[in-house]
Amino acid sequence: MNVFLSKYVNGVDKKSRVSVPANYRAVLGKELFNGVIAYPSIRNNCIEVCGISHIEKLRQMIETLDPYSEERDAFETMIFGEAVQLSFDGEGRIILPQSLMKHAGIEEQACFVGKGVIFEIWQPQNFEKYLNAAQKIAHEKRLTLRNAH
């Protein structure tokens, strides 16, 4: 399967290492880089994580914007300027930079949330709050999926 699915909570050790779920690593196994690209989410207080191929798609989308626009500059700065390449160690762990941990409020535990082409890393209690709000929105907007093609 080529999508990130499910939710997992893993511990973060004193060296800021956290194990990426095995099925997420399997999806990323098709990438040229043995690791992930992580950057602060521009939507939520979490970390967005993907492979090199998705970063390339984001680059292509951003390049369609006017090169001198405020929006393009903001997206380039927040996604590419803040992104870090994180390699897997022999045990499938990555080291989360302090700046990303602070952005997401992560300390001792990290909640991995599959979002299809990307996954997010949350502070577990913050994700539970978000999940409650997302459930309400999904329920209210459920009919919009019927028209999606």
Swiss-Prot record:
Keywords from the UniProt entry: Cytoplasm, DNA-binding, Repeat, Transcription, Transcription regulation
Location of the SpoVT-AbrB domain: 7-54, 83-126
Localisation: Cytoplasm, Nucleoid
InterPro entries: MraZ (IPR003444), MraZ_C (IPR035644), MraZ_dom (IPR020603), MraZ_N (IPR035642), MraZ_sf (IPR038619), SpoVT-AbrB_dom (IPR007159), SpoVT-AbrB_sf (IPR037914)
Gene3D superfamilies: Transcriptional regulator MraZ domain
Superkingdom of the organism of origin: Bacteria
GO biological process, one term: negative regulation of DNA-templated transcription initiation
Primary subcellular site in the record, as a coarse category: cytoplasm
Annotated GO MF terms: DNA-binding transcription factor activity; transcription cis-regulatory region binding
Family: Belongs to the MraZ family.
Listed name of the protein: Transcriptional regulator MraZ
